[in-house]
UniProtKB/Swiss-Prot annotation:
Protein name: UPF0210 protein OEOE_0945
Organism of origin: Oenococcus oeni (strain ATCC BAA-331 / PSU-1)
Family classification: Belongs to the UPF0210 family.
Quaternary structure and interacting proteins, as annotated: Homodimer.
Entry superkingdom: Bacteria
Length: 447
């Protein structure tokens, strides 16, 4: 092997913030459905501990063997709304606490899948599960939630959009941090290893290993070597860098699966930033040529970055999946925070950026007095982008009681610090209150 390639890999880890962001075990809980919530909860806890008992130990051993940091060890499970048909509200709470306790018992960082898929309609159990979010997200430590309210095939469930906006307001009144643990999706994927939106799809194996890589700092350092070169050279440099990053993810994921006796699922190529300087997607975009992220040209630069990441990744692995692109969470990215404080980056610009990247309006703090209908309308706008363009979009928005524009909130750790961003004050209430269903686009009709 070329010694320069070895040195490059060492430098990626030691100087450029490269890491495996997550090794996530997906576990099907469909065989855990019991006669009531209590029995389902007991079966859920037993299966998770049985399947994932050695996940953390195995990942830590691979960290030592290869010197590659694995930041998070996580679990995703079957959407809980599919398990809880026989449960009442108290039964749902018992299942939630069993999931949280199982995650703690096996030592993982997070467990995702307290979720509902309601893009076309909602069952009584699904409505009850959403109603439980304020209590569940404020009383559990490791549990993550998601809702899928739209898809290209189904259109947008505006009733669910309205209910979700009201639920987000209720969560914020109990604990604003609870909304950092809830993602609202259009076109959610079944094999996403990243939180808070991970769940284990019904078409997946009984248990599987998925990996999420991360390397904004590696991409930024690579682009520093091609300053003043044409944009074609920039795209090629990102592509070759993504190839190297993905190969490491493929290696770690495959070995983890082999050691645990499970099938290997996918590598998610997403560039996931952290609040640390030098580990920022915004800084990558600025290295492409923007004075500050959010200025004119940002959407074009992000499209280039996202596309080149995908092209490099699919050359490195046959098993690419999840969201696979660039994440733009405001509170988790030092460059995004700077641009927000400077007034360069707005919610409207972030919405435009989501049309060409992996996710959506992510980790955005807004004034505590924002109406629920405005939050619902933000979700509807993001869903429209995803539905029309046949891609995943999402919203993770955090109303902060008592805070207004100019203030900020510090979530700590990887969640970072969020400046309070302004929202448009004109009302969307009449639109959201119409309810019903926004039809699927004509191009979704393919049969």
């Amino acid at each position: 092997m070329d010694i320069n390639k070895i040195n490059e890999t060492i430098q990626m880890i030691s100087e450029e913030h490269f890491d495996i962001r997550t090794v996530t075990m997906g576990i099907s809980l469909l065989d855990c459905i019991g006669g009531d919530g209590q029995r389902t909860a007991e079966k859920v806890h037993r299966k998770i501990v049985d399947k994932a008992g050695k996940l953390v130990e195995t990942a830590q051993q691979l960290e030592r063997d290869f010197g590659v940091p694995i930041v998070n060890k996580r679990i995703s499970v079957t959407p809980v709304s599919l398990l809880a048909g026989n449960a009442d509200y108290d039964g749902l709470i018992k299942i939630a606490r069993a999931l949280d306790q199982a995650a703690a018992d096996v030592g993982v960082d997070f467990l995702g899948g307290y979720s509902a898929l309601i893009q076309k309609g909602s069952t009584p159990t699904e409505k009850m599960l959403i109603d439980s979010f304020p209590e569940v997200l404020s009383t559990t430590k490791l549990l993550m939630s998601s809702i899928n309210i739209a898809s290209t095939k189904a259109g947008i469930n505006l009733n669910a959009v309205g209910k979700t906006g009201r639920t987000i307001k209720r969560i914020s009144e109990v604990d604003p941090l609870g909304n950092a643990k809830l993602v609202v999706f259009a076109n959610a994927v079944e094999d996403n290893p990243f939180m808070a939106g991970a769940f284990h799809g019904v078409s997946e194996d009984d248990a599987v290993i998925n990996v999420g890589v991360s390397g904004p700092g590696v991409v930024k350092r690579a682009l520093e070597t091609v300053r003043d070169r044409s944009i074609d050279v920039v795209a090629e440099k990102i592509k070759t860098t993504a190839f190297k990053i993905t190969r490491i993810g493929q290696l770690i994921g495959g070995l983890t699966a082999k050691k645990l006796g499970l099938p290997f699922g996918i590598v998610d190529l997403s560039l996931a930033p952290t609040p640390a300087r030098g580990d920022s997607v915004a800084e990558v975009l600025e290295e492409i040529g923007l004075e500050q992220v959010g200025t004119h040209g940002t959407t074009a630069a992000l499209m280039l970055l996202n596309d080149a990441i995908k092209k490099g990744g699919v050359m490195a692995s046959q098993r690419v999946g999840g969201l696979s692109g660039a994440f733009i969470p405001v509170s988790e990215d030092a460059g995004m925070i700077d641009a927000t404080v400077a007034g360069t980056l707005s919610i409207s610009k972030l919405e435009a950026m989501t049309s060409v990247c992996s996710v959506g309006l992510d980790m955005i703090a807004i004034p505590g007095n924002t109406p629920a209908s405005t939050i619902s309308a933000m979700i509807a706008d993001e869903a429209a982008i995803g539905v029309q363009n046949n891609k995943t979009t999402a919203v993770r928005v955090i109303p902060v009681p008592g805070k207004s524009v100019g203030d900020s909130i510090d979530f700590g750790g990887l969640l970072g610090r969020a400046p309070i961003m302004p929202v448009i004050e004109k009302s969307s209430t009449a639109f959201i209150n119409r309810g019903g269903h926004i039809p699927a686009p004509i191009h979704s009709f393919k049969n």
